[in-house]
Amino acid sequence: MDEDVLTTLKILIIGESGVGKSSLLLRFTDDTFDPELAATIGVDFKVKTISVDGNKAKLAIWDTAGQERFRTLTPSYYRGAQGVILVYDVTRRDTFVKLDNWLNELETYCTRNDIVNMLVGNKIDKENREVDRNEGLKFARKHSMLFIEASAKTCDGVQCAFEELVEKIIQTPGLWESENQNKGVKLTHREEGQGGGACGGYCSVL
């Protein structure tokens, strides 16, 4: 455990098969992109430490298969999570339509009601868009989620998605526990009104 790490957070990435969950994870953790990346079998897991507004957090990021046959993994997968990234493909409307199913699953299996959710519309680098940005934003607002559009291929919005999610988690009292409570760690906050950090207008904090 690093002495300067404020906390360790469990982050989940969920969504239909083929929406780019693993690609987003690899872009964020390893800064790589593989257009031929195979579908996840079961659960993948990566760890990355980031600093948000002066607060360093270690992220344990779980990437799960979107296929129905792997749903038996669900209960243990959701247990203890503080943040969820729900991904759809902006070029496949069916993945957007099925977001409600994923939210229902989240409500069923999540062990707490103050979990922070981020909606990500992936693959904005492609031209054959079927889901408008405003549709994603409207859905996110309806369900009190953070929202961003991104591209794992070009890296647009990827870093921002994780940073905004972590920032919101840290700002939520009781959602996480400090691993340095006896070391006098002081939680720092971004100045009020400073706005979207490095998002460049991508993120909407709702």
From Swiss-Prot:
GTP binds at S17, G20, K21, S22, S23, D34, P35, T40, G66, K123, D125, A152. InterPro entries: P-loop_NTPase, Rab, Sigma_54_int_dom_ATP-bd_1, Small_GTP-bd, Small_GTPase. Its cofactor is Mg(2+). One of its GO terms (molecular function) is GDP binding. The modification N-acetylmethionine is found at M1. Its EC number is 3.6.5.2. A motif (Switch 2) lies at residues 63-80. It is an enzyme of class 3 (hydrolase). It catalyses: GTP + H2O = GDP + phosphate + H(+). The modification Phosphoserine is found at S144. The modification Cysteine methyl ester is found at C203. Residues 204-206 form a propeptide. Mg(2+) binds at S22, T40. It holds the Pfam family Ras. A lipid is attached at C199 (S-palmitoyl cysteine). Keywords: Acetylation, Cell membrane, Developmental protein, Endoplasmic reticulum, Golgi apparatus, GTP-binding, Hydrolase, Lipid droplet, Lipoprotein, Magnesium, Membrane, Metal-binding, Methylation, Nucleotide-binding, Palmitate, Phosphoprotein, Prenylation, Protein transport, Transport. Regulated by guanine nucleotide exchange factors (GEFs) which promote the exchange of bound GDP for free GTP. Regulated by GTPase activating proteins (GAPs) which increase the GTP hydrolysis activity at the ER membrane. Inhibited by GDP dissociation inhibitors (GDIs) which prevent Rab-GDP dissociation. It is found in: Endoplasmic reticulum membrane; Golgi apparatus, cis-Golgi network membrane; Lipid droplet; Apical cell membrane. A motif (Switch 1) lies at residues 31-45. A lipid is attached at C203 (S-geranylgeranyl cysteine). NCBIfam families: small_GTP. Belongs to the small GTPase superfamily. Rab family. Interacts (in GTP-bound form) with ZFYVE1. Interacts with ZW10 and this interaction is enhanced in the presence of ZFYVE1. Interacts with BSCL2. This is Ras-related protein Rab-18. It comes from Bos taurus.
